[in-house]
């Protein structure tokens, strides 16, 4: 798969799934796209709280990179995938396992 095809597929998938351009760039100059999910949860002895899942995605030299941030805590590593479609399938699964919907 060529870098041009990967970029084209990436842009289509990003548009279809509601990610927005944050205006930020990685140190290598790649544009970062982001989407955030929120839900209200009941916490024992605390009451109602907001549960947040934020996913940032960008493409670096033809490789989709995904960064997961849950309740303000950054996951231990940046995930990389072999294609934009695989990255989006993984994001959908992460969102589903978090109890949220795309």
Can you say where each PLM-predicted feature lies in the sequence?
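Amphipathic alpha-helical segments
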Residues: 2-23
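N-terminal non-cleavable signal-anchor helices
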Residues: 7, 14, 33, 42-44, ...
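Compositionally biased, low-complexity intrinsically disordered regions
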Residues: 8, 50-52, 86-89
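Generic short N-terminal amphipathic or hydrophobic helices
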Residues: 2, 12, 54-58, 68
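N-terminal regions of proteins, emphasizing targeting and processing segments when present
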Residues: 10, 17-18, 45, 59-61, ...
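Mixed-charge, Lys/Arg-enriched low-complexity segments
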Residues: 63-102
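Amphipathic, interaction-prone secondary-structure segments
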Residues: 17-65
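Acidic/proline-rich low-complexity IDRs
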Residues: 2, 52, 99-101
